[in-house]
Amino acid sequence: RNNATDIIIMKQQNQKELEKIIEEFGDLFGTGDNFKKLYNEAMKERYSFLYLDLQTNPAKAYVRFEKQIGEGDKLLF
């Protein structure tokens, strides 16, 4: 994960796993709360996923590969 440039996060069935993911990537999007909002926005539709582009500075978050919903600590929805 340290060398990852792109991350795809599917819906998590286990709350502890989601908390670990938030702990790992939350700071890239300001706070863990911001990251959880991004995750929840991405999971609204069935079979959706959260895509994180970590190559950019600041990092960007997308619903699938289609709609940008976050850039650094800014939420875009």
Question: Where are these predicted regions, by residue range?
Answer:
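Conserved ATP-driven motor cores of ASCE-family P-loop NTPases powering translocation/secretion/packaging/pilus
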Residues: 1-58
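Conserved P-loop NTPase motor module
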Residues: 46-77
